[in-house]
């Protein structure tokens, strides 16, 4: 009886000693595996990706906009089966054992979604990586309640590609598709060319189109004031429309994606009795459409 009790105690002790080893499952690229890839580098978008073996990809991205922006996504091979509370800490690499862990924040990963962080916290991740540390996400495994998952970003080989990413972000256009998708520009009297202020705005639209392959429709509608006769006004608006058709074709857009229409003095938006009203009516409305996948 005593031998049985002793054996049971010994076995229990052995199992207990091994239990903590089964509690955590850690995903991180080894120094030999660690890579950072600049997968998109254009004036419209910057994307920096870090593969995490057997787990998925960590991705930083920033897009053309009025405001500087940064998004981070933890793209998982298997989406979260349940919503989980997540602890985000910054850990030192194994070769710097004297350093302590620093808490960054607490957040949630939602069921059926990849992990997402935006704003200042995303910038904090980059800052920790630049210091050579390992930002680490920790949460309870939704498949095994007695196990926690740890997912770490390796800072090995980070700095070089981060420099490229930073340069890309600094060169992003300072406006988004939404800022230019509907634009009203203006003409001087009896001129088929836009006025100087509108030409600058048109150049912005052109820059966006040059770098975006998703623009599949450009609608151009031109209008005049009421100074001239109906026939003269119609002819002027049609010539203005054709000038813009040629302009958008020169950017590489296929002709079947460009639709232009001259309306002459029809559809005024202001009173033609005043100079200000005439200026407003001498206009072109440019609308852009794009394919969203």
Swiss-Prot record:
Gene3D superfamilies: 2.60.40.2540, OmpA-like domain (3.30.1330.60). Residues 175-292 form the OmpA-like domain. One of its GO terms (biological process) is archaeal or bacterial-type flagellum-dependent cell motility. Keywords: Cell membrane, Flagellar rotation, Membrane, Signal. It holds the Pfam family MotY_N. GO terms for cellular component: cell outer membrane; plasma membrane. Transmembrane segments: none annotated. Residues 1-21 form the signal peptide. It is found in: Cell membrane. It is a peripheral membrane protein. The keyword Membrane applies. This is Sodium-type flagellar protein MotY. It comes from Vibrio anguillarum (Listonella anguillarum).
